[in-house]
Amino acid sequence: MSIKIALAGNPNCGKTTLFNALTGSNQFVGNWPGVTVEKKEGKVKGNKEDNITVVDLPGIYSLSPYTGEEVVSRQFILDARPDAVINIIDATNIERNLYLTLQLMELDRPMVVALNM
């Protein structure tokens, strides 16, 4: 059984940093929004069965897309139906991040909220 986990959140909240930590990848990170412009997939390191895939999605503020990057993220979350979503939230600006969190909760899929400082 394979498991697919999506990393979702606002731009520049730490999604790619978490992706790199979980997968052992070395994807480029920057301290500004818009660094990740396409989805990236990797296997969780240390998982002997090699059956857990993590998907790093471009940053989005809501499930109502305005940019190409937001369309990529929205389509993956709604159409690919990941087994779970890790919603990364910038703990320094929680209020701005919660709109997306509420939308993700309404999808009724397993979700973890991860606060990042």
List each model region and its residues.
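Conserved C-terminal guanine-recognition region of P-loop GTPase G domains, centered on the G4
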Residues: 44-49, 72-117
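Conserved G1/Walker A P-loop phosphate-binding module
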Residues: 1-68, 79-80, 84
